[in-house]
Design a protein with these regions (language model features):
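Helix-loop boundary and gating motifs at the non-cytosolic
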Residues: 2, 6-77
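Hydrophobic core of transmembrane alpha-helices in multi-pass small-molecule transporters
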Residues: 39, 106, 112-163
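Transmembrane alpha-helix termini and helix-breaking/packing motifs in multi-pass membrane transporters
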Residues: 54, 58, 86-91, 118-126, ...
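Loop-to-transmembrane helix entry/capping segments in MFS-fold secondary transporters
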Residues: 63-65, 143-144, 174-184
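Membrane-interface helix-entry/capping residues at the boundaries of transmembrane alpha-helices
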Residues: 67, 89, 103, 181-182
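Glycine-rich segments within core transmembrane alpha-helices of 12-TM secondary carriers
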Residues: 73-80, 110, 178-201
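Helix-to-loop junctions at the C-terminal end of transmembrane segments
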Residues: 79-97
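Cytoplasmic membrane-interface "Motif A"-like loop-to-helix N-cap segments
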Residues: 91-112, 128
Length: 201
């Protein structure tokens, strides 16, 4: 009589979302990449908002103009653009998936907007000299340049924020979504703390 001993090894747990499958290591890698992206994006958000506020106030605009440019218009673009782009992204089918092409599309706007805002004083002076100081003052020229690049930055940021959240819903398994968004919020707060600490001491 023979006794056969079998050694069963537990199969690694698998999580699925759509056509994607993850092991525990895959989930960890996914979280690291997404949260690293969120950390960098949060630093950008805080830097852009702080610089834009200081920059536009240096042009001595009224509180009404400040609120219109910095607060009102971004909210309007959010209301109008996000549903349109989200709808198109939901129905897009391509080699890189539904979200990545739209994230790539927003990158040039965000990059150009950030560089342009920083260069607004220089570009404003160039615009004044090109048009003529008798036609436009330095302050008006610099504010015009600032607004162009601020709207570019706002356009790219508004769309990227909506698409990134949709990407998270596409690639993170449903039973991890709550934990992910908790970490997402925590990383954003840590980025804010670090930014304020190193900038303001």
């Amino acid at each position: 009589m023979f006794h056969h001993s079998t050694h069963e090894t537990a199969a690694p747990r698998i999580w699925r979302v759509g056509t994607l499958t993850y092991t525990a290591g895959g989930i960890a890698a996914l979280f690291c990449w997404l949260l690293w992206g969120d950390f960098a994006w949060s630093l950008k958000e805080r830097a852009a908002a702080s610089v834009a506020t200081l920059m536009i106030k240096s042009f001595e605009v009224s509180d009404f103009v400040y609120g219109l440019i910095i607060l009102t218009i971004p909210n309007i673009t959010n209301i109008i653009l996000v549903p349109i782009v989200s709808y198109r992204s939901d129905r897009h089918r391509g080699r890189w998936g539904r979200r990545i092409p739209y994230l790539w599309m927003t990158t040039p706007f965000v990059t150009a907007g950030m560089i342009g805002i920083g260069a607004s004083p220089f570009l404003g002076r160039q615009l004044m000299e090109a048009v003529g100081p008798e036609h436009i003052s330095y302050r008006a020229a610099a504010l015009t340049v600032f607004c162009i690049f601020w709207f570019m930055l706002d356009f790219g940021t508004t769309l990227a924020n909506g698409i990134f959240v949709a990407l998270v819903n596409d690639v993170v398994p449903r039973n991890f979504l709550g934990r992910f968004f908790g970490l997402f919020r925590g990383v954003s707060l840590i980025a804010g703390i670090l930014f304020n600490y190193f900038l303001f001491g």
